[in-house]
Amino acid sequence: MPVLESKLNPRSADFAANAAAMRALVDDLRAKLEVVAQGGGDAARAKHTARGKLLPRDRVGLLLDPGTPFLELAPLAALAMYPDRDGSDSAPCAGVIAGIGRVSGVDCVIVCNDATVKGGTYYPLTVKKHLRAQEVAAQNRLPCIYLVDSGGANLPNQDEVFPDRDHFGRIFFNQANMSAQGIAQIAVVMGSCTAGGAYVPAMSDETIIVNNQGTIFLGGPPLVKAATGEVVSAEDLGGGDVHTRLSGVADHLAQDDRHALALAREAVAHLNKKKAAALDVIAPRAPLLEASELYGVIPADTRKPFDVREIIARIVDGSELHEFKPRFGATLVCGFAHVEGMPVGIIANNGILFSESALKGAHFIELCCQRKIPLVFLQNITGFMVGRKVENEGIARNGAKMVTAVATAQVPKFTIIIGGSFGAGNYGMCGRAFGPRFLWMWPNARISVMGGEQAASVLATVKRDGIEGKGGTWSADEEEAFKAPLRQQYEAQGHPYYATARLWDDGIIDPADTRRMLALGLSASLNAPIADTQFGVFRM
């Protein structure tokens, strides 16, 4: 397979400037990740451990096979969205740790409530993150392990947590349907499990509860007293002894957190789970070029072009790419490669999308679907070309072919936004709405319906036409005063931290970690069979 040769000079001033700019962004990302990893803060953590409980991340660590990685989902979910009175983040990590890890040799989705964050209660973004984890489990046919320690819905936010289709109730809907599909559901009750949340263990295939610590009840002692006048302790109402000896809601009684996690590992060991997909996996080889050089590839000035092959060469095995149609539709690079020995089809932006690029992309997607090869999209796109000439040539029709191919492709799809993600280009390059198994962003990325300058210019033109149509005038200073806040709005709303807080992605990643993250996602996808693709009608 042809080896991609780098034309970059890592000793050049431009490379050094680019690398310094990216390194600053990565340092900021790491700092934010360190903060949210602490959960609810020192006081809450001390209170948690004083009760004999392991900290949430320690629970996850003990559940995993020793030395194996944890592919965490959306660690910065809810960032700055629910500020406390002092301005600090009230819901770091959205109050729940979620991701994919190996347990007793089996890839599993783990959802772990963080009771140090507002008692593990569910904010709107907590629900969204929990549902996203279940979606990952369903798509990849991964057993779910729920480490439950939650006070249920966050009551001040109940209108955004309880009533709608994709609110709290959807968790239990998903549990029931995944169980029906043979996707194991295992609950470990390590603290409170109240009200509707009680259905997490009650609807699991197998449930473990920690004695004198875990509780399960639809109505807690205060509600029971208010409703019936009965005075009862939490343990007598819904403790481990009650539910493993009398009610049968739980199956195994653990003596402490460590024992409970050991029982969970035993439960997974008896699932008789095997990977389903039949990819032709070969021996992995490291790229010939250093991943750390990715820092210097992307220009600090986003207006400067670069060759996306420089990025591909630092991600794929042996820096090898068998490029498809290299002389046609040059603004889209397509080709076959391997990542940690797993075959992939790469689709990477190298400029704006023209009709030729879109047709090439659609053709390549057809090939990958026929061969059942996963697709990897490297997004850096301002959109499809516009103008009278390209419209006459059918850019909408040809762009629709690519969008249709992306939408209907049944192979696992993975998207990494390495630069811009604007307008319909987001759709053609497998944005969130098009169901990629995972979508990550680099810290330099931007995502909006269009760029801030373009949006400000469009709206300013509309306003100027309205003023002048009524016989008025609009000075250059007035126009700039109108456009400046729009630019600021688009910059703020298109920023990766704004996006990741709202779960528009599965996390912001260090560019140097791209290959590792992609390999973990690909490996997880091998647990599900790859379905045949049936394309819709292509307008010819």
Regions found by a protein language model. Name each.
Residues 1-540:
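Ligand-binding clefts of soluble mixed alpha/beta catalytic domains
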